[in-house]
């Protein structure tokens, strides 16, 4: 993985490389974590995701003790809906130790539709709520990085 990243960096045409790993603690996830500068943890607002977030935080902490260079940039709330349960869970997340990005990604049918079409959401439905949210989140993330946060 590190050789791949070095080759991409040498090429000079890529500013950011994103590894989108499936949930779980696999060899691919560990390799991606060990090769990363930042970790963004996407979380849907439900009990399983909260437990997964706790597990991932413990695993990253363990890897940091073994030389993981990456820092957790924050939690990205996905499939957000305007409900009382989501609002309460959102507030609970924000009380934790892991930073939470201000921009949530709203739930929309366009996201699963784009996966069935095998087309990135940005091309499939750029004006969808989630498409707009992802662009806002990228601005938030890069804005923090560009300002030393």
What are these regions (language model features)?
Residues 5, 60, 138-141:
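Hydrophobic residues within well-ordered, non-membrane alpha-helices that form the packing/core
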Residues 7-103, 109:
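Conserved catalytic-core segment of NTP-binding enzymes
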Residues 136-148:
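C-terminal alpha-helix
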């Amino acid at each position: 993985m590190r050789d791949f990243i070095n080759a991409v960096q040498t090429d000079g045409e890529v500013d950011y490389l994103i590894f989108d790993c499936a949930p779980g603690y696999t060899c691919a996830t560990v390799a991606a974590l060990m090769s990363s500068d930042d970790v963004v943890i996407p979380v849907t607002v439900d009990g399983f995701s909260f437990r997964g977030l706790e597990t991932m935080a413990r695993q990253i902490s363990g890897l940091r003790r073994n030389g993981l260079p990456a820092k957790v940039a924050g939690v990205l709330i996905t499939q957000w809906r305007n409900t009382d349960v989501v609002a309460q869970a959102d507030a609970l997340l924000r009380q934790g130790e892991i930073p939470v990005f201000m921009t949530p990604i709203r739930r929309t049918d366009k996201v699963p539709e784009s996966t069935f079409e095998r087309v990135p959401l940005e091309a499939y439905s750029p004006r969808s709520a989630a498409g707009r949210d992802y662009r806002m989140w990228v601005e938030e993330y890069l804005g923090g990085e560009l300002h030393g946060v």
